[in-house]
Amino acid sequence: MKDPRDVLKRPIITERSADLMTEKKYTFEVDVRANKTEVKDAVEEIFGVKVEKVNVQNYKGKSKRVGRYTGMTSRRRKAIVKLTADSKEIEIFEA
């Protein structure tokens, strides 16, 4: 994971993540191979903010059926990034 744009896939904007933004916590979908240090470095480099801590959650792929054929959806990894108190806000979430 060299390029930070390979680590962060997209922001996740839901009702719960919008409530967490008031506490300076932002939610991203990240690469399944990325660790907490890589996520922290990527957020700091892309958005120019200071990260206090990173929490990650792994989601298994779900089994899906189309007729008699079964398959699996992709597994996912979600990161909740908390910024320091003196850090600025991330503008991408302020729409």
From Swiss-Prot:
InterPro entries: Nucleotide-bd_a/b_plait_sf, Ribosomal_uL23-like, Ribosomal_uL23/eL15/eS24_sf, Ribosomal_uL23_CS. One of its GO terms (cellular component) is ribosome. Keywords: Ribonucleoprotein, Ribosomal protein, RNA-binding, rRNA-binding. This is Large ribosomal subunit protein uL23. Part of the 50S ribosomal subunit. Contacts protein L29, and trigger factor when it is bound to the ribosome. Belongs to the universal ribosomal protein uL23 family. One of its GO terms (molecular function) is structural constituent of ribosome.
